[in-house]
Design a protein with these regions (language model features):
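Short hydrophobic alpha-helices and adjacent helix-cap/hinge residues
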Residues: 2-184
Length: 184
């Protein structure tokens, strides 16, 4: 009985730690706008934006968030002024993730909830790739995801990991960085 209570408590803490603060539809709108502030976006992307929505296998919240983001992005006419496609994928491991991003010429990688323990290895795997990593959770940004979203005093706040942005050849304009919380 005590083990069940401890497990239940642990799961409740994990769910609270990995809950999405900013609604996914708003995340999609902010992502579409932020892409246009990356000086390298069109050169990296080419004629069409390819977004990979990464979900955790066996995690219903992760799957729901990925599907919701796909629907939200599909309703937006352009990202960074370009047409776009979105694809859902389940995470296997960091090396496979990097291979998929290279093979599919991914410009944006959206990381759904459920990956707090894998963000460091994901960061290392995609550090050499020129792509914008976007986290569904604010906690992902200090650990190496380039762009994230938080709720501060009831308002959405953009978060940017500037060190990782430079590694991934993301060059946000200074005027937009003034509006974000920057991590270095």
């Amino acid at each position: 009985m005590l083990v069940g209570a401890a497990t239940s408590s642990l799961l409740a803490r994990r769910a609270a730690a990995e809950s999405i603060a900013v609604p996914i539809r708003l995340q999609a709108e902010l992502l579409a706008k932020m892409a246009s502030y990356d000086r390298n976006f069109q050169a990296r992307t080419g004629e069409r934006v390819r977004t990979l929505l990464l979900t955790k296998l066996g995690d219903p919240e992760s799957a729901r968030a990925g599907a919701e983001m796909k629907t939200a992005l599909a309703s937006i006419p352009s990202i960074g002024g370009l047409p776009h496609d979105e694809e859902l994928a389940s995470y296997a491991d960091a090396a496979a993730l990097a291979d998929i991003c290279r093979a599919r010429k991914v410009s944006i990688l959206y990381v759904a909830p459920g990956f707090s323990q894998q963000v460091d290895t994901m960061r290392e795997a995609v550090s050499e790739l020129s792509l914008l990593t976007v986290g569904s959770l604010a906690d992902y940004v200090p650990n190496g995801i380039v762009l994230g979203f938080d709720l501060v005093s009831g308002r959405s706040k953009l978060l940017v990991n500037l060190t990782q942005a430079r590694r991934q050849q993301i060059d946000f304009r200074a005027e937009v960085l003034k509006l974000t919380r920057v991590y270095e």
